[in-house]
Amino acid sequence: MQKKVKVKPNSKQQKIAEQDDGSLTVHLKSPPVDGKANEELIKLLAEKFAVPKSHITIKSGLSSRQKLIEIDTDI
């Protein structure tokens, strides 16, 4: 399954909000430095979708706030 994700780093609290179009807005505490925000994003999405972190891949937008995430739910 693929999801469009808008990331908001340096937030005060972690939060995942689903938008009307099915995309996600994810608020992260980590700064967008050295991949820390991407690591936190993968960890949060793994918890939300109950899959291992290895089943989540950032397909595009590695250094952007707009990302396309691939979630392998076939366990």
UniProtKB/Swiss-Prot annotation:
Top-rank taxon, per record: Bacteria
SUPFAM superfamilies assigned: YggU-like (SSF69786)
Region: Disordered, residue numbers: 1-32
InterPro entries xref list: DUF167, YggU-like_sf
Gene3D superfamilies: YggU-like
GO cellular-component term (any): cytoplasm
SMART domains per UniProt: DUF167
One Pfam family in the UniProt entry: DUF167
Family the UniProt entry places it in: Belongs to the UPF0235 family.
PANTHER family: UPF0235 PROTEIN C15ORF40
Cited HAMAP family: UPF0235
Protein name as it appears in the record: UPF0235 protein Ava_3894
